[in-house]
């Protein structure tokens, strides 16, 4: 620029995951550019502009005539620009590509698609510098590989600059009552709001994170209702993804202008949208991973040398232990590992279509370009050719279901290219990896009784019962975005809160398990309360109240039963009300792992014992329940490292989980088009078509590439089959023993699982009362045990 040699071309592409972030970046570039011009002593004429799906046709034409030197965009828009002939020419001089919030892209299919686009861009223009900006993430080396990709099977060079150690953290775990177990639910509720109000009033601006959208709305409503002098419509607002873009933008602007005392959010403010200065971040209950905790708390003191201040409010003993270990890991820099999806065949199909639009490709060369992406470095030739075969319409049966060829293949010349004049339009209007979603209507006897979320519907299979509006219903069948139910009695098989829960990370779960093992050792070696309390103070960063609550929790579990840990899987046989029996697996591995384990066990039980099984899962374990005999342990022991994945895969057939995942994959791979000739297809129509296609494909070829991807996504992304397999291996090689116990009252560690699942029909007050009654009964049992042992 100083030499006056800037051409009308793009030199730098800045990619962020959110359109709102793009707009922030453009504004925030103004000052640095002015500073550069001031140093240079002249107007350098460096242009910047945002290009997203919201950019008008007029603005796009303007960019073609005079393109920005710094182009700010999203992953999806970059993919479209790579196949736009006129604008593609403007990218020929790109020297830098900057990816903001790379951690939020790397862990999902948007990142997978972006990694292919980066290789496509390199194919077009040659070498360029890639820069990734990330919040706290681990392992940095893997994210670096994701950023730069591979060359001839060897990872490209990447310099890593880690500045996390420069950030000063002030994090504490707080409890709203002096004794979590003895306080009733109303005391805990009032204590939570009083504590939260105190924290907000002590600071200028506070950001509060709940883990659900419903929780966000509830906290805003109750703060205004309970403290009308402190909160009103002018100084407190909610921010979550279900609110309109206009409402979210108004909240962000008010925050920047310092007009808000507090904002309550679910997850929508985790990424680095510019919201001005935040003094304090409060997390209501566990954020379920160290990286998420640090990301949220990092919104306070957002500048490099400023302290980040966070408080985590816990409301039960499981949360207290979980957050105390999380706090230890955060302070000691131990971050959960990121999971980057591999070999996603639906995204590959979409990208191959995009490549074909540019010009014909040599099949071997295209394979080499694709495998330069970190996400496809291990892509097999068979999978690649299967996707090409599908895209070329070689499954002739699919034409019966209106799935037509998108590309042609010339095997003699070993090339492929686009088919049809509408290719660019179809690609541009159907690009992307985020599936359309909508509320699912629940109908009973022809009457609509409410809505559930689609990811909740995924859990349902015929005969499952759940609670909606205080009533229990039995799931009969689903059709499109409507499900048919019947009134039901008895406990629900699927807890109604399931769909909005954040899953506990496997790494944090295993650290909690290790703490459990340490505590178990102290008790077994006869250490005194004082010695164990000293260990808790030394090991965790907690105050007197918290340390004592943790001690009491563990001493009750140890005295009444056994302490499960990373060395011991405890299986508890508990007889519930009536003839109902429970097999409780104390498997603290996180909900995604427990989802996989419980499905596999339930599948064996249902197949071998012909029993209608109820499942309830949490981060801390799962239970199977049925009337009469239940072979839960016997079924679990049949799982081996060799058969586990196959059994879990079989359990997915005829489930809503597979149907929903297939619908998403069919959309990404362009089997179903979300938009065609200007018409958008409703989610309901997509759902119906997805189910018809799934059944057709299963009969046509059970190893069809997109069906194969739907299974992979369900197993690896929706559940966590790989870490579940690690658990099976730990047991198989003797590193984790299985111990069983029989109880007339659930053990303390099982209280929350039993009350949240089996008693989902109860309100929070009744659940708390039930838990207190169980706790009292356990203490009576412990007294009897102590008398018998003369301790």
What are these language model-derived features?
Residues 1-414:
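Helicase motor core with emphasis on the C-terminal RecA-like subdomain
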Residues 139-142, 151-152, 179-190, 405-457, ...:
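A contiguous, basic/glycine-rich beta-loop/short-helix subdomain that forms a polymer-engagement track
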Residues 174, 211, 454, 478, ...:
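Surface loops and adjacent helix of pleckstrin homology
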Residues 367-370, 374-439, 452-453, 495-497, ...:
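Extended, highly charged accessory segments
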Residues 463, 468-469:
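Loop/turn positions that initiate beta-strands
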Residues 471-478:
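Short beta-strand-centered aromatic/proline hotspots
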């Amino acid at each position: 620029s100083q030499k006056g040699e800037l051409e009308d071309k793009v030199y730098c592409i800045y990619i962020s995951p959110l359109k709102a972030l793009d707009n922030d970046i453009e504004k925030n570039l103004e000052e640095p550019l002015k500073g550069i011009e001031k140093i240079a002593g002249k107007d350098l004429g460096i242009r910047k502009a945002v290009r997203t799906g919201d950019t008008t046709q007029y603005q796009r034409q303007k960019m073609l005539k005079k393109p920005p030197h710094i182009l700010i965009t999203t992953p999806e828009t970059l993919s479209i620009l790579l196949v736009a002939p006129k604008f593609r020419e403007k990218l020929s001089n790109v020297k830098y590509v900057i990816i903001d919030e790379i951690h939020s892209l790397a862990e999902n299919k948007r990142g997978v698609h972006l990694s292919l686009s980066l290789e496509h861009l390199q194919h077009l223009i040659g070498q360029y510098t890639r820069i990734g900006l990330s919040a706290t993430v681990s392992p940095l080396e893997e994210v670096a590989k994701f950023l730069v990709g591979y060359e001839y099977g060897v990872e490209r060079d990447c310099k890593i600059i880690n500045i996390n150690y420069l950030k000063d953290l002030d994090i504490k775990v707080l409890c709203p009552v002096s004794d979590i177990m003895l306080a009733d639910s109303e005391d805990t509720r009032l204590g939570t709001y009083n504590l939260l109000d105190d924290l907000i009033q002590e600071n200028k601006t506070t950001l509060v994170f709940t883990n659900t959208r419903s929780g966000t709305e509830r906290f805003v409503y109750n703060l205004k209702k309970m403290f009308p002098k402190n909160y009103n419509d002018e100084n407190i607002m909610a921010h979550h993804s279900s609110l309109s873009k206009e409402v979210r933008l108004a909240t962000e602007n008010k925050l920047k202008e310092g007009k808000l005392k507090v904002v309550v959010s679910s997850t929508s403010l985790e990424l680095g949208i510019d919201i001005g200065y935040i003094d304090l971040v409060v997390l209501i209950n566990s954020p379920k991973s160290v990286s998420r905790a640090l990301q949220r708390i990092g919104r306070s003191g957002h500048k490099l040398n400023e302290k980040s201040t966070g408080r985590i409010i816990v409301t039960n003993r499981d949360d207290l232990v979980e957050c105390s270990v999380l706090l230890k890991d955060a302070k000691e820099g131990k971050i959960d590992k990121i999971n980057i999806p591999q070999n996603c065949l639906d995204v590959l199909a979409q990208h191959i279509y995009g490549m074909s639009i540019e010009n014909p490709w040599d099949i071997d060369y295209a394979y080499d370009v694709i495998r330069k992406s970190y996400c496809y470095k291990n892509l097999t030739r068979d999978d690649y050719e299967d996707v090409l075969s599908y895209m070329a319409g070689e499954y002739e049966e699919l034409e019966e279901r209106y799935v037509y060829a998108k590309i042609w293949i010339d095997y003699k010349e070993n090339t492929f290219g686009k088919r049809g004049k509408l290719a660019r339009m179809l690609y541009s209007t159907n690009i992307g990896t985020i599936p359309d979603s909508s509320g699912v209507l629940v109908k009973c006897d022809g009457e609509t009784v409410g809505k559930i979320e689609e990811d909740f519907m995924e859990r349902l299979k015929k005969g499952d019962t759940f609670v909606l509006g205080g009533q229990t219903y039995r799931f009969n069948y689903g059709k499109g975005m409507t499900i048919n139910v019947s009134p039901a009695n008895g406990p629900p098989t699927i807890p109604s809160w399931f769909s909005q829960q954040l899953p506990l990370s496997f790494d944090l779960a295993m650290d909690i398990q290790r703490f459990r093992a340490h505590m178990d050792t102290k008790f077994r070696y006869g250490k005194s309360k004082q010695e164990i309390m000293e260990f808790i103070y030394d090991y965790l960063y907690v105050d007197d109240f918290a340390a004592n609550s943790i001690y009491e929790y563990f001493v009750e579990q140890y005295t009444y039963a056994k302490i499960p840990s990373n060395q011991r899987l405890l299986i508890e046989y508990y007889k519930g009300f009536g003839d109902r029996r429970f097999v409780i697996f104390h498997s603290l591995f996180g909900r995604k792992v427990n989802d996989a384990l419980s499905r596999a066990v339930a599948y064996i039980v249902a197949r071998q014992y012909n029993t209608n099984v109820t499942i309830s899962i949490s981060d801390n374990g799962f239970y199977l329940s049925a009337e009469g005999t239940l072979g839960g342990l016997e079924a679990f022991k049949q799982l081996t490292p060799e058969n586990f994945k196959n059994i879990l895969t079989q359990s997915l057939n005829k489930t809503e989980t597979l149907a929903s995942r297939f619908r998403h994959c069919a959309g990404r791979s362009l089997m179903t088009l979300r938009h065609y000739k200007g018409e958008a297809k409703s989610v309901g129509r997509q759902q119906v078509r997805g189910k018809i296609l799934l059944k057709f494909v299963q009969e046509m070829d059970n190893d069809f590439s997109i069906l194969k991807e739907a299974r992979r996504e369900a197993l690896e992304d929706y559940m966590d089959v790989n870490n579940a397999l690690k658990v099976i291996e730990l047991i198989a090689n003797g590193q984790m023993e299985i111990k069983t116990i029989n109880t007339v009252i659930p053990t303390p560690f099982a209280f929350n699982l039993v009350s949240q699942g089996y008693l989902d029909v109860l309100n929070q007050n009744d659940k708390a009362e039930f838990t207190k009654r169980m706790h009292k009964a356990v203490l009576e049992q412990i007294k009897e045990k102590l008398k018998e042992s003369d301790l």
